[in-house]
């Protein structure tokens, strides 16, 4: 639909189109208000999650792809220097946290919902916190300014996944697309095999990496300068606050939306790196990370919602680039739909493998010998 636009018009469209994330955040209170007086009060809490995973994949196919890249010499420096894009991403933080607290209050006081409506509410809020909150935190923790670092950490603390702040930058980006990385799914590996290992390894590896950082400074692992202690303490304060304010239902709400949010994150990791690997060189090291080591998805609509997260190939090759100047590479392996559609597909391993395994084999045509059991484990 928009692929024929000139690069200049596409960049202008996206500059203001990134505010589309507000639809996801406002979808939570809107779904509640629309439920008032409804004959089906337990259906409305499921609205957001239903739209994300039911309607968005269809809209991605209709709206189409975005091939436009900013011009490297003239447009990229100007766009990276514009404070507008930073304000846009940082604006998500107070609105998401406000939405989270308000949603907990609604769950604790809404008497028309039975467990079905309550479950839909928790999953919908978790979907927004995962899709928007963790996506923005991912953008922020890669940047140097302390404000952005702290804002990203706060969003992760709000979903009990602060370890991502350490492990993603110092672990995943170092070992991506190798057997050493728990966030890089192997060829032939199902989502349900991937998730438990990702949860466990990424939590433990975050603590290991932070302990190593402190050791280099001559400090013990359990030291007040261990940032994970502080971030997890904030998560504990969130839990305590929700429990005191909204009772046991508030605690379930906070923990439930957290699990939904960080599970979405790990499913996206599964999608982003499935079956791709960096070759081991003669010296025992792995080849340098390039845009060819992550799946790219260039569907415009979801890229606007997710701050160009789907241009993941460029992100891994150049992690410090800001979201507004991430590039599309035709040479990168390409996903057949946006992340929402790919997440749904990943939930059904036979369908996932029927679609994705041929794409992996085609991408490594002539090098299929690398897709062995040893590469998968």
Swiss-Prot record:
InterPro entries: AlkB/XylM, FA_desaturase_dom
Annotated positions binding Fe cation 2: 173, 312, 315-316
Keyword Nucleus: no
Top-level lineage group: Bacteria
Pfam families: FA_desaturase
Function description: Catalyzes the hydroxylation of n-alkanes in the presence of a NADH-rubredoxin reductase and rubredoxin. It preferably hydroxylases C12-C20 hydrocarbons.
Entry protein name: Alkane 1-monooxygenase 2
Organism the protein comes from: Pseudomonas aeruginosa (strain ATCC 15692 / DSM 22644 / CIP 104116 / JCM 14847 / LMG 12228 / 1C / PRS 101 / PAO1)
Protein encoded by which gene: alkB2
